[in-house]
Amino acid sequence: MNTNQNTNLKEITMYTDGACSGNPGPGGYGVVMLYKGHRKELSAGFRDTTNNRMELLATIVGLETLKEKCNVNLYTDSQYVVNAIEKGWAKKWRANGWMRNKKEPALNPDLWERLLKLCEFHNVKFNWVKGHAGHPENERCDQLAVAAAKQPNLPLDVR
């Protein structure tokens, strides 16, 4: 994570959420991006995925959508995502060959690698928000994610 905010960069506010029915099961992600009065919403669904993969993918897709380096205030209800980045867990897992400890592999290394690279490019500040607590943008992300997970003929997860 690059927390040195550059005042010459665009300031993006991003909300993300993932949802999964069954865990594993069909899942989806939702993203709401805000910039100077503009709004962009993104969502997609996959079959046979997990909630954590969808939380990660929401964050990744949102950041990958940005066409240039930006300052990003990212809000998610996923403590998994926030803690792994803010507490440095994901970087430690990568340094240890994607192992959480000597016996347990870290889950979702494909997605963590993508997210870490994006965080090295953008200036991202991760913020945790309580899910299902009435925050309008977080609620919208949840609606997008749940609706995406219910679509017919979902593709396989992006593993």
From Swiss-Prot:
PROSITE patterns on file: RNASE_H_1
S-S bonds: none
Cofactor detail note: Binds 1 Mg(2+) ion per subunit. May bind a second metal ion at a regulatory site, or after substrate binding.
Subunit structure: Monomer.
Source organism of this protein record: Desulforamulus reducens (strain ATCC BAA-1160 / DSM 100696 / MI-1)
Any single biological process term in GO: DNA replication, removal of RNA primer
Keyword annotations: Cytoplasm, Endonuclease, Hydrolase, Magnesium, Metal-binding, Nuclease
PANTHER family with a match to the protein in the record: RIBONUCLEASE H1
Protein's UniProt name: Ribonuclease H
UniProt cofactor(s): Mg(2+)
